C-alpha cells in the first residue's frame, strides 16, 4: 500500500530552461533537491522529470545563476536563468582550489568545452593557435605530430625551450617539444609530445601566462602553464553521442617557388575520424567516457597517421565530507615522416632549394625522369614513429571542520616513443648516394624513449569571513619526479629487408638517462576587503635535484592587488553603470624560474675508445656557482565592461626581467676550454596585451560575438656579463645570435649596402632583424541564428624577419637571382649579401571556418542530430613566397632554445575540409 501511495504521489513534471533573452539552454542540469533524481535539458531546452508536489527543482547551467522552483499543482515550469557576473568565473590557481576570477590580480586565457568541441584540431597547440589572444603558437612543419614554437610575453631564456608546463587534472605530463636527445636525424622535423594529448576529453583549458600567475607552479613555469581539466560527467540521465568526420587534406602550395614541387610530392589525402561518448550520473556520482579513432594519409605520398584514444572521467561523493575525482586516458599513435630541410635526403628541399635545377624551365622529358626518381625515393623512405601514452589522475577532496578543505592529488604520465629510421640500399641508389648494384650499405636506427612523470600534491584551503573581510588561504606541498630513458641501437652495412639490428654486421648502441625530482612548498593568501578590493600574497619554496647539490632551494614570491570599482553600491546605483557596467584594476609582481640542465654545474669527463682501449677526455668544465635563472615580472591591468558587459575591454602592461640568465658563450680557442653554461646574462621583455570581446547582436534567435586582440612585445638582451656574442641556432653564414642590445636570437650576417656607383660596402656581423615578431594577435567571429552556428578564427603578426634559405640555396646553385642586383651576381660570394635573402615575416592567417546546424529532436531515437563543415588553414596572406611559421633549422638540443626565423625545406601545415555528423541519444 505504501508503494501504491508513493506511485500516486509522483507525477511527471515538464518544462524548459531559457536565458533572460529567451534563448533555450541545452544541457542545463535539472535536479530534485535532496535526491539523486536528475536530468538534463535537450537541445530545445526542454526537460521531463518525475517528482512530487512540494519538492524543489533546481536548474543550473555553467555561466548562469542557479534557480530553484517549488513544485505545485502545475505540471509545467519555466526556468529563466540570468547570466552570472563575467568576473565570477572560477580559475584554478595552482595546485589548490579555485578562486573567483574577480579576486585575482593576474590574467588567464580560457577555452571552454563548447569552443573546443567545434574545432577540428588534432593537437593541443593547433587548438590554441588562434583561440588564445596573447600567445604566439607557430607550427614548424606540416608533417604529422610535429612541434610548434610556443611563446607568451617574449623569449625569456636562451637555455631552454619556451614550451609551457602542461598539467592535466593536476598532473604534470611530458611536454617535450623538440626531438629527443637520441632522436632520428630527419633534417629538422621534431616530434612533439603535445601531439598525443587527447583533445576530445577536454572540458576546459586555462592558459596561464608567466610572472605572478605561475609562481605557485614551480620548476620551469616561467614560460607559462597550460592547465587542462577533463570531462567527468554531469548529473542527470545518461547522454550518448556517436560522431563521424570525413574530409580531405591538401598540401598548401601558396609558398612554393615551383608548382612542379606540388606535382611531385603533394597528393590529396583522405581523413576519417570516429568518436563515441557517454556521460551522466547522479548527485552522488558522475562519469564520462570517450573513445576515438582517427586516420589520414596526409597530403603527400609518404605521411600517414593513425591515432586511437580512450578516456574516462569519474566523480563520486563517498560521503558528505569526502569526494573522489579520477581521470584516465590511453593514446596510441602511429605516424610516418619524410626527410626534410637540412639533409641531402630531403626531396622537398631538393626541389625548392634548386638542388634538381630550375623546375620551371626543365624539359618535360627531364621532368618525367625527376618525377619517377622522386616517386621511387618516396616509396623507399621508411621513418616510423609509434607512441603509447597513459595518463592517470586521482584526487580526493575532504571537508574538514572550520571551513577547511583538504585536496590530495596523485597521478602519473607514462609515454613511450619508438622511432625507427630504415635507410635501404635501394633508397640510397635512387638518391644517387651509392652506385647501382650496391647491396651492403643499408642502415637501421631504432630509438626507444620512455618518459615517466609522477606527481603528488597535498594542499589545504580555508575560507573565512570576518565582518567586511573575506579570506581564502591555500597552503600545500608538491612533489614530482621525471625519468627520461632513451636507448638507441643502430646497425650498418646491411642488406635490404633487414628489420632487426641483429642482422647487421656492424652494431652500435648509445643511451641517455635524465632523472630529476622537484620539491615545492607553496602558499597563497587572498584577502577581500568589502568584497571589492582583494590583496594576494603568496610564494613557493622550490628545489630541483637537476640543479646539483651546490644549489639551494629557491623562494619565489608573489603579491597582487585587484580592485573591482564597479562592485561598489554607489557605482551600481549611478547612471554611468547603465553604460559602463564593470571596472576592474589589477597589479601584481611575481617570480618564476628555469633550472639549468642536469649536471651542468659538475666537472665531467668523457670516456671514449682509443686504439681499442679506454680513453678519458675533458668534457663539461663545471661551474660550482651555477644557479637557476629567475624571471621577475611586474604587471598592471585594466578591465572594462560596457552595456551590461556586452562589450569587454582588457588591457595589460607587463615588464619581465630574467635575472642571472643562463648563457653558454663560446670560449676562445686559446683557453683550451669547452663551453660552459653560466649565470652572466639579463633579458628584458616588456609590452602590453589588449583584447576586446563584443556581443554585437543579442536577440532571441540571433547572436553575434566578435573578439580581437593585439599584443606588443619588446625583447632585448640587456646584459651579456662581458661575454662575446654567441650563436644559438641557424647556420654558419647567417645565424640566430645572442648579443647585448639585441633581441634574443636575432638574425646576424654580412650585409651589402649600395654605394650608388655600382659598388657595394660589405658589413660583417650586421643586424638583419628579429626572429620574434613584436606585434601579434588573434581575431574571431561567432554567429548563431536559431539552430545554425557559423564561426571564423585567425591570427596575425607583424614586425619580425625571416630568412628564406631555400631562395639562398637556389641562388647559390645559379637558378634564381630574383631581386639580386646584377652588380652583385657572380662578383662575390652570396654569403656577403645575405640581407637580400632576409624578409618581413608578417602574416594574416585564417585558421578555421566552420558552420554547424542542430536539428534537435526530430525522431524518438535521437535527442539531437548535428551536421557540420569546417575548413582549416583556408586563407593566408603573407609578404612573399615563404611561410613565416615553418622553420627547417630545428632545435639543436633536447628541450633547447629555438627562435625560428628560417624558412627552409619543409612543408607548411595542410588545408583540411571536414564534414561531420553527430547523433545524440
Which residue ranges define each predicted feature?
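Extracytoplasmic beta-strand/coil segments of soluble accessory domains associated
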Residues: 50, 126-175, 180, 203-204, ...
Amino acid at each position: 500500500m505504501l508503494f501504491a501511495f508513493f506511485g500516486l504521489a509522483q507525477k511527471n513534471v515538464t518544462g524548459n530552461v531559457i536565458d533572460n533573452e529567451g534563448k533555450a539552454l541545452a544541457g542545463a542540469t535539472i535536479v530534485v533537491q535532496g535526491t539523486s533524481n536528475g536530468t538534463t535539458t535537450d537541445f530545445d531546452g526542454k526537460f521531463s522529470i518525475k517528482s512530487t508536489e512540494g519538492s524543489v527543482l533546481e536548474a543550473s547551467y555553467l555561466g548562469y545563476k542557479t534557480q530553484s522552483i517549488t513544485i505545485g499543482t502545475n505540471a509545467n515550469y519555466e526556468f529563466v536563468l540570468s547570466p552570472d557576473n563575467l568576473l565570477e568565473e572560477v580559475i584554478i590557481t595552482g595546485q589548490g582550489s579555485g578562486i573567483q576570477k574577480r579576486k585575482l590580480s593576474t590574467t588567464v586565457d580560457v577555452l571552454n568545452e563548447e569552443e573546443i568541441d567545434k574545432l577540428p584540431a588534432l593537437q593541443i597547440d593547433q587548438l590554441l593557435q588562434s583561440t588564445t589572444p596573447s600567445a604566439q603558437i607557430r607550427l614548424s612543419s606540416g608533417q604529422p605530430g610535429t612541434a610548434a614554437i610556443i611563446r607568451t610575453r617574449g623569449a625569456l631564456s636562451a637555455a631552454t625551450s619556451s614550451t609551457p608546463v602542461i598539467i592535466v587534472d593536476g598532473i604534470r605530463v611530458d611536454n617535450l617539444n623538440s626531438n629527443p636527445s637520441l632522436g632520428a636525424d630527419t633534417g629538422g622535423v621534431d616530434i612533439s609530445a603535445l601531439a598525443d594529448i587527447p583533445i576530445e576529453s577536454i572540458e576546459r583549458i586555462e592558459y596561464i601566462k608567466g610572472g605572478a600567475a605561475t609562481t605557485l607552479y614551480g620548476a620551469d613555469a616561467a614560460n607559462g602553464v597550460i592547465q587542462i581539466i577533463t570531462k567527468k560527467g554531469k548529473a542527470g540521465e545518461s547522454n550518448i553521442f556517436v560522431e563521424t568526420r570525413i574530409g580531405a587534406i591538401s598540401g598548401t602550395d601558396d609558398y612554393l617557388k615551383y608548382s612542379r614541387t606540388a606535382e611531385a610530392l603533394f597528393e590529396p589525402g583522405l581523413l576519417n575520424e570516429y568518436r563515441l561518448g557517454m556521460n551522466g550520473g547522479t548527485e552522488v556520482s558522475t562519469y564520462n567516457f570517450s573513445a576515438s579513432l582517427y586516420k589520414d594519409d596526409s597530403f603527400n605520398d609518404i605521411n600517414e597517421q593513425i591515432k586511437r584514444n580512450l578516456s574516462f572521467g569519474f566523480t563520486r561523493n563517498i560521503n558528505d565530507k569526502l569526494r573522489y575525482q579520477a581521470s584516465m586516458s590511453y593514446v596510441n599513435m602511429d605516424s610516418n615522416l619524410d626527410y626534410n630541410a637540412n639533409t641531402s635526403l630531403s626531396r622537398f628541399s631538393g626541389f625548392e632549394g634548386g638542388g634538381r635545377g630550375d623546375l620551371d624551365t626543365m624539359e618535360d622529358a627531364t621532368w618525367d625522369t625527376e618525377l619517377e626518381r622522386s616517386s621511387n625515393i618516396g616509396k623507399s623512405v621508411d621513418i616510423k614513429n609509434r607512441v603509447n601514452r597513459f595518463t592517470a589522475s586521482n584526487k580526493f577532496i575532504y571537508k574538514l571542520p572550520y571551513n577547511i578543505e583538504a585536496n590530495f592529488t596523485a597521478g602519473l604520465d607514462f609515454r613511450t616513443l619508438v622511432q625507427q629510421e630504415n635507410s635501404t640500399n635501394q633508397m640510397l641508389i635512387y638518391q644517387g648516394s651509392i652506385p647501382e648494384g650496391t647491396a651492403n650499405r643499408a642502415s637501421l636506427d631504432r630509438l626507444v624513449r620512455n618518459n615517466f612523470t609522477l606527481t603528488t600534491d597535498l594542499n589545504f584551503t580555508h575560507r573565512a569571513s570576518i565582518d567586511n573581510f573575506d579570506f581564502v588561504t591555500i597552503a600545500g606541498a608538491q612533489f614530482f619526479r621525471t625519468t627520461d630513458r632513451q636507448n638507441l641501437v643502430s646497425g650498418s652495412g646491411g642488406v635490404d629487408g633487414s628489420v632487426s639490428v641483429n642482422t647487421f654486421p656492424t652494431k652500435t648502441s648509445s643511451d641517455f638517462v635524465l632523472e630529476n625530482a622537484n620539491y615545492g612548498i607553496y602558499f597563497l593568501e587572498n584577502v577581500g576587503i568589502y568584497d571589492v578590493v582583494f590583496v594576494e600574497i603568496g610564494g613557493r619554496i622550490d628545489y630541483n635535484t637537476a640543479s646539483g647539490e651546490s644549489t639551494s632551494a629557491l623562494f619565489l614570491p608573489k603579491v597582487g592587488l585587484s580592485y573591482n570599482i564597479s562592485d561598489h553600491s554607489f557605482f551600481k546605483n549611478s547612471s554611468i553603470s547603465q553604460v559602463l557596467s564593470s571596472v576592474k584594476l589589477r597589479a601584481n609582481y611575481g617570480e618564476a624560474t628555469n633550472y639549468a640542465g642536469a649536471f651542468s654545474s659538475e666537472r665531467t669527463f668523457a670516456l671514449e675508445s682509443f686504439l681499442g682501449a679506454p680513453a678519458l677526455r675533458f668534457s663539461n668544465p663545471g661551474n660550482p656557482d651555477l644557479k637557476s635563472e629567475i624571471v621577475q615580472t611586474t604587471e598592471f591591468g585594466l578591465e572594462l565592461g560596457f552595456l551590461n558587459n556586452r562589450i569587454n575591454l582588457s588591457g595589460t602592461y607587463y615588464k619581465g626581467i630574467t635575472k642571472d640568465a643562463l648563457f653558454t658563450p663560446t670560449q676562445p680557442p686559446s683557453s683550451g676550454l669547452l663551453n660552459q653554461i653560466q649565470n652572466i646574462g639579463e633579458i628584458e621583455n616588456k609590452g602590453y596585451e589588449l583584447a576586446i570581446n563584443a556581443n554585437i547582436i543579442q536577440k532571441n534567435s540571433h547572436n553575434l560575438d566578435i573578439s580581437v586582440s593585439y599584443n606588443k612585445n619588446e625583447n632585448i638582451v640587456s646584459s651579456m656579463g662581458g661575454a662575446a656574442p654567441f650563436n644559438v641556432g641557424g647556420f654558419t653564414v647567417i645565424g640566430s645570435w645572442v648579443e647585448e642590445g639585441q633581441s634574443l636570437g636575432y638574425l646576424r650576417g654580412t650585409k651589402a649596402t649600395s654605394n650608388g656607383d655600382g659598388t657595394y660596402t660589405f658589413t660583417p656581423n650586421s643586424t638583419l632583424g628579429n626572429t620574434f615578431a613584436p606585434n601579434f594577435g588573434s581575431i574571431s567571429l561567432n554567429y548563431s541564428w536559431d539552430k545554425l552556428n557559423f564561426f571564423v578564427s585567425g591570427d596575425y603578426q607583424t614586425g619580425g624577419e625571416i630568412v628564406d634559405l631555400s631562395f639562398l640555396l637556389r641562388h647559390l646553385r645559379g637558378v634564381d637571382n630574383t631581386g639580386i642586383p646584377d652588380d652583385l651576381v657572380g662578383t662575390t660570394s652570396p654569403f656577403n649579401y645575405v640581407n637580400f635573402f632576409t624578409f618581413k615575416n608578417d602574416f594574416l592567417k585564417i585558421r578555421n571556418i566552420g558552420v554547424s546546424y542542430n536539428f534537435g529532436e526530430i525522431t524518438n531515437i535521437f535527442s539531437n542530430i548535428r551536421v557540420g563543415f569546417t575548413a582549416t588553414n583556408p586563407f593566408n596572406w603573407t609578404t612573399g613566397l615563404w611561410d613565416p611559421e615553418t622553420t627547417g633549422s630545428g632545435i639543436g638540443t633536447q628541450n633547447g632554445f629555438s627562435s625560428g626565423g628560417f624558412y627552409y625545406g619543409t612543408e607548411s601545415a595542410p588545408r583540411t575540409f571536414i564534414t561531420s555528423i553527430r547523433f545524440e541519444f
